[in-house]
């Protein structure tokens, strides 16, 4: 065993199998939430590196072994998460944990064949969740490509509301505008809930003055969001075609979603066997068996005229260089997939288009689930996103019972600083609240804040 046993009485007992990119991201997020974590992996060096960095226990061994799970404390575990690179091992781990413990189980399953059978696997193996980082990352990329001028598009309220991140261009209508004047000069159906300026994140008040170069996150319905973008002079049309470099699982999931949206897709992959498999799974895509890191190959594939470029080679350095090249040689919307944290500080200073960290897409979903199990029965967390490099959170709460926040005018309640209620969803209606609005039982409420660790809607109160 590596690490020191540190029982945090308020936290859950969590076992994580797999110390790769996803497992490490889960440790990073969940350790910061105050849980008791035991990490299992066959690689002693990986275990030691993580236990040196975080206050967690580490165990070297096979997570599918009953004996190893017993040593890890399966009898007292509340949650068991298997996120190795092997779908079969993850399912075996969860099966053993479910039979021998009383914990909730979550498995990573990323193979397309298994992913299509997720409902069957959950039911028959008693899994609480099946997670697929590649598929979820593809959904994020697909949403972002639906609005090419956006740096990020997130979905809330079962698709009724979007949170969209854009950078204010020089000379734009918003440059120099106070947020309180937005309704008078542009629209009333948009809430600007977070702003990043010169590396600092703000939850803006009505008196906050927007500036060119600001990164803003705003919330609106899909229709109103596009209307707002048109009014401020930004294009909202869908891309026509996309070029993907790399033929892995994430490329398959992304191409499948783009083709379904009517977008022409080309994939460059150097491995002939992968090309053959992709041509069968994606008959409407153009599959090119060549080296996508070769400048001439990219030119022949039409990089100069393509509308979207997404490098998914599996190697961060290649993806970054390809994105920089595409930004220089084309007008394409560029999305850069980054797997590791090593480059995070550098990546944030580079013009790489929209940057996606797949491991954090999944870890946000699991953190939301864990917080929902930890909180009171008065509400549940439905959706959680870390935004602006985890310096702020966007949380969607479902209010299930009367509490200190229900039945009162918002203007009569005192909220924590750096917090904004972005919307209230009541039945199928979206309300962008003012001071006279109230929160009712049955509502979904979205909160954006630079405070961290909210588990319950009542945490918004000062």
Question: Where do the protein language model's features map onto the residues?
Answer:
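Cytosolic regulatory regions of ion transport systems
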Residues: 1-462
């Amino acid at each position: 065993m590596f690490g020191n046993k540190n029982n945090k009485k308020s936290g859950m007992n969590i076992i994580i199998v797999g110390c790769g990119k996803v497992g490490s991201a889960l440790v990073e997020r969940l350790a910061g939430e105050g849980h008791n974590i035991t990490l299992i992996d066959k690689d002693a060096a990986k275990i030691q590196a993580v236990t040196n960095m975080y206050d967690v226990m580490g165990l070297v061994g096979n997570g599918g072994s009953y004996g190893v799970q017993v040593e890890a404390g399966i009898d007292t575990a509340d949650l068991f998460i298997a996120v190795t690179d092997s779908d079969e091992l993850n399912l075996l781990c969860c099966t053993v944990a479910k039979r021998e413990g009383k914990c909730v189980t979550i498995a990573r399953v990323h193979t397309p064949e298994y992913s299509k059978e997720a409902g069957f696997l959950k039911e028959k193996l008693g899994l609480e969740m099946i997670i697929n980082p590649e598929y979820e990352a593809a959904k994020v990329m697909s949403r972002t490509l639906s609005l090419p001028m956006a740096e990020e598009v997130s979905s809330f309220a079962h698709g009724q509301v979007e949170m969209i991140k854009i950078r204010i261009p020089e000379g734009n209508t918003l440059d120099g505008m106070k947020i309180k004047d937005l309704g008078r000069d542009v629209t009333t159906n948009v809430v600007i809930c977070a702003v990043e300026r010169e590396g600092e994140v703000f939850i803006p008040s009505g008196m906050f003055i927007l500036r060119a170069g600001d990164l803003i996150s705003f919330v609106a319905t899909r229709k109103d969001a596009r209307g707002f973008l048109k009014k401020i002079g930004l294009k909202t049309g869908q891309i026509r075609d996309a070029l993907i470099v790399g033929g892995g699982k994430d490329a398959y999931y992304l191409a499948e979603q783009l083709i379904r949206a009517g977008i022409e897709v080309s994939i460059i992959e150097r491995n002939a066997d992968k090309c053959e498999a992709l041509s069968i799974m994606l008959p409407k895509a153009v599959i090119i068996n060549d080296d996508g890191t070769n400048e001439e190959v990219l030119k022949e594939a039409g990089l100069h005229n393509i509308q979207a470029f997404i490098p998914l080679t599996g190697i961060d350095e290649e993806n970054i260089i390809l994105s920089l090249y595409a930004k220089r040689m084309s007008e394409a919307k560029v999305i850069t997939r980054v797997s590791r944290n090593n480059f995070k500080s550098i990546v944030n200073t580079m013009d790489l288009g929209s940057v996606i960290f797949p491991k954090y897409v999944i870890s946000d979903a699991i953190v939301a689930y864990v917080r929902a199990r930890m909180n009171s029965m008065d509400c549940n967390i439905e959706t959680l996103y870390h935004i602006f490099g985890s310096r702020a959170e966007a949380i969607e709460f479902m209010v299930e019972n009367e509490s200190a926040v229900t039945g009162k005018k918002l203007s009569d309640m005192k909220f924590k600083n750096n917090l904004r209620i972005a919307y209230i969803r009541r039945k199928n209606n979206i309300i962008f609240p003012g001071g006279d609005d109230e929160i009712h039982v049955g509502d979904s409420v979205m909160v954006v804040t630079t405070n961290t660790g909210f588990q319950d809607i009542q945490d918004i109160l000062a």
